[in-house]
Amino acid sequence: MLYNIPCRIYILSTLSLCISGIVSTATATSSETKISNEETLVVTTNRSASNLWESPATIQVIDQQTLQNSTNASIADNLQDIPGVEITDNSLAGRKQIRIRGWICPYISRHLLSLNPLQARCRRYSRGER
């Protein structure tokens, strides 16, 4: 079934469609800019991401240049130089265990070492577990 649409309504609807496309493109561009500006991810023991400058704790940053210049075989080897970080090899298929100030993350080799730190589960050792 064909409808007879007046030319004025067609032009206005086409114009509004074009304007909405421009606005959505501008919104997408600004969100991409936000993502590219936030390159530093802070990994804490409570598994949440936060801004580096808003954190109340002492933070060590290993930047991309340091990782590129490093001769270490893994990220775990780079983390060994940070105070409060202890790396142990539990010899289960080459997995490493990382303790950050007494907190142990049993799945850290799968998540942090594969650059997915938000899924790592951490727990605090009690005196009887050491």
Swiss-Prot record:
The residues covered by the TBDR plug domain are 51-130
Per the UniProt entry, the signal peptide is: 1-28
Pfam families, alphabetically? Plug
Does the record's keyword annotation contain Methyltransferase?
no
Do the record's keywords include Signal? yes
Which chain regions cross the lipid bilayer?
A: none
SUPFAM superfamilies (alphabetical)? Porins (SSF56935)
The alphabetical list of record keywords is: Signal
What family is this protein classified in?
A: Belongs to the TonB-dependent receptor family.
Q: What else is known?
A: Encoded by the CP4-44 prophage. Maybe missing up to 600 C-terminal residues compared to orthologs. The original sequence is interrupted after position 81 and the original C-terminal 552 amino acids are deleted.
Its recorded name reads Protein YoeA
Q: Which organism is it from?
A: Escherichia coli (strain K12)
Give the organism's phylogenetic lineage. Bacteria, Pseudomonadati, Pseudomonadota, Gammaproteobacteria, Enterobacterales
